[in-house]
Amino acid sequence: MSGMRTLGEFIVEKQADFPHASGDLSSLLSSIRLAAKIVNREINKAGLVDITGAAGVENIQGEVQQKLDVYANEKFKSALEARDQVCGVASEEEDEAVAFNKELNKNAKYVVLMDPLDGSSNIDVNVSVGTIFSIYRRVSPIGTPPTQEDFLQPGHKQVAAGYIIYGSSTMLVYTTGNGVNGFTYDPSLGTFCLSHENMMIPQNGNIYSINEGNYIRFPMGVKKYIKYCQENVPEDGRPYTSRYIGSLVADFHRNLLKGGIYLYPSTQSHPQGKLRLLYECNPMAFLIEQAGGLASDGVNRILDLKPTELHQRVPFFVGSTNMVKKVEEFLEVYRDEA
């Protein structure tokens, strides 16, 4: 392919985008790239070897861990610990943040938060899954163990974030705060190649993504917004199309490319929402804003929320700017109604 650029080449080219450019972030992203290849290889074996199904234990959220959750968590942790840029990680699959105590990691500048395998319950039925990651500069002194404060930073302090989607093709999409770029994995070469440069989400979309099976439990503002999406107003592009996969990465990726909104509101059973702020919502919010969209909890900008705990949950509305603004309007009008 003429002019093809690999992820490694692109990272080095764009190193100057990072305010403290020294090659550390490039090396960190390289470790994520390596782990993604390993996890991708294992996912592609699903159904051939005993890696699907439940692992028989629950994570801190009370969710049954899938075997591939555990596998992906260990591979990403190992890849990050093997470089000298990361002093600790926080993961959906770990009760507490994990400090890397090797001599190698003592002077590391970064912490990584991740959902190692989002949508893993879909593996058994061959539906797209993904990895989400978020990178911060530590705030504690270099040379000391990482602290809780290193991980509980608001999203606007992220220095990089991204996701890997394991689907019909495997893609890695990331930002360092200077636009969003996507790379497709070429298995014949064993490398990620630039396929989607400077990704931008349309300001308007015609796709809404929400689990309508929970409709009865939604806030009134969300119910009214869904009805708005379903109204027959051709001059306004409505009714919109409903598309919901049940894998955040897959739903987000489609809407990023096509234009749309993903909604996971609070419900009666989950009044604080269900998605985790630090390693699901913040990285996706960083990406969508860099792509020209918006991310909100229904009232506030996601990236401005101050985390108080590692596995904190929030309502989440993310996607095309005008669609997110519209759902915020409905939530404001019907705020006092159940």
Curated annotation (Swiss-Prot):
Key words of the record: Carbohydrate metabolism, Cytoplasm, Hydrolase, Magnesium, Metal-binding
GO cellular component annotations of the record: cytosol
Cofactor(s) the record lists: Mg(2+)
PROSITE patterns assigned to the protein according to its UniProt record, in alphabetical order: FBPASE
Catalysis: reaction(s): beta-D-fructose 1,6-bisphosphate + H2O = beta-D-fructose 6-phosphate + phosphate
Highest taxon of source: Bacteria
Protein name: Fructose-1,6-bisphosphatase class 1
Binding-site residues for Mg(2+) 1, renumbered to this chain: E92, D115, L117
Species per Swiss-Prot/TrEMBL record: Vibrio vulnificus (strain YJ016)
Pathway named in the protein's UniProt entry: Carbohydrate biosynthesis; gluconeogenesis
Major enzyme class: hydrolase
Matches recorded under PANTHER family: FRUCTOSE-1,6-BISPHOSPHATASE-RELATED (PTHR11556), SEDOHEPTULOSE-1,7-BISPHOSPHATASE, CHLOROPLASTIC (PTHR11556:SF35)
E.C. number: 3.1.3.11
Binding residues annotated for substrate, in chain numbering: D118, G119, S120, S121, N211, Y244, Y262, L263, Y264, K274
